Amino acid sequence: MKEQEIIAELSHSYFNHILREVRPFLEYFNDDFLDSSLTAPIDSELLERLFFMAAITSLDVSLPFNFSDSDVVKSHRKHRWLTSVQSFGSKSKQGIVGKSRLFNAFTVVVKRAKNSKFDEITMRDFCVGINLNKILRQAPFFVRTLGGFQHKNQFNIVTEFVDGRTLKTFLQSKRSSWMDFLNIFFQILLGLEIAQNRLNFSHYDLHTDNIILVPVERSFTVSLYGSNYTVKHDYRPVMIDFGLSSVHTKGKTLGQTNLENKGIFGHMSPGYDIYVFLLFCIDVVQSTNLSIYKGITDLLGFFNSKTNISMDLLTNNHIQSLEKGVSNLVPYQFISYIRDKFSPYLNVDIGPQKMSIDRCLGQKPMFLRLKHLLDRDDELEPLNSPLLKKGFVKTLVNNIKVYYWYREKMVLESDQTAQLIETDKEILDNLIDDLELKIVRKGSDKPQITVEQKNLFFMALEYYNFIRELRLEESSEFYKTWSKRFKKTWVCRNIFSQLDCVIREERLTKCPTAGATLEK
């Protein structure tokens, strides 16, 4: 498929998903709502839905890529909800960037291409952004793309406004420390690892103007591969501008193929961002902040230790370095390297992932958040039919969520409970069998954990944490015995000593041959 066809298909899937969520509330999105003052707390995820409702119900704008919305009543114009466009940010060769007011309450960023020559960059920026939105709860290190619209035959992207300073400004300050930079970079690695694992994401333009540092007042936790990383640093980095980026989702790979001679491909290159980013930083600090410059040089030792490429080549020829093995390194390997070499300088608490009640409950359902904001007369009722998940544990977690959020008690009959527990026994016993397998590959004399076993382990770990949080070990001999068996499996005892290698193996199998992804 051609890239524009991929973008249209992925965008239509996104629009249909959002439309299903907001359709019950479209009749409430009227002049009275637009005239009211939005005083309730509105996070960026909810704002994304409100933006979509504004765009799809406007007379003078349309959703891009010929999305069919003929059954939606249109009743207002863009100036009612998007106003005061002002120039903003550094000048760009490709596009025009401005700040606007959304619903006269929120500052947002509006971007459009300078001319049709750069339309594909703007469209890719949008499509990569809406897919990154899917992981922002797990990885709050990317700007949220609120949506896009067509106005006067021009495509516009709208993103949240990230209120902070650029990493470039931070690096140019002599008051900035190496320890601060290390903590910022460590968070970037967490974000890139999650994005690569979930979406085969590569940014490909991660320079110091494309990272905004947001001041944070309280710690936050990122979960990754069975560990919790509680970040206590003063800044959270947010990555922006995805016009050169690549993602893979729904069986489609999105990315450009015009810059392969610079090491930038139409698909993921695992080591590109983590390496080239440090080179961008060196260019900024080498004459302004010698402490950070020396620290970054020390960090480049990671690539030297993994590839035996000389430091001279690493700092002076990034194309050759990428080709000689740097592109095949993954962010998680760098995370492990920093934990091993620089942990005293990290303002991050690292411990085993636990399944708390809050984590079980998840975030308040979008239906209830929209209802609270729009259905002021409390007319709409949620459609909550009983849902039996696959097995007793998952069903119990689901029923707890339903009761907590909707105050609706889901009662299981005794025969249903027995049947669901039998399903769990089959699932969980099969997991134990798979995690006890010792697979010795050709040419090796030691067993190695496979990619499939790694994935099954984290599935089993989720069950284990749910069982402990729900205290099922106290009421069921089966769950008590299974938990003990799980902790003793060969994979459970060896997973973290082999995790770097398994993740790297898995990541490299996701990288197609350069140039074979897209049809131009």
Swiss-Prot record:
List of residues binding ATP: F88, G89, S90, K91, S92, K93, Q94, G95, I96, K111
Coiled coil: 416-442
Top-rank taxon: Viruses
Sorted UniProt keywords: ATP-binding, Coiled coil, Kinase, Nucleotide-binding, Transferase
PROSITE patterns for the chain: PROTEIN_KINASE_DOM
GO molecular function, one term: histone H3T3 kinase activity
GO biological process, one term: intracellular signal transduction
All residue ranges annotated as the Protein kinase domain in the record: 82-393
Keyword Nucleotide-binding among record annotations: yes
Function: Probable kinase.
Family: Belongs to the protein kinase superfamily.
Name of the protein described by the UniProt record: Probable kinase 098L
Originating species: Invertebrate iridescent virus 3 (IIV-3)
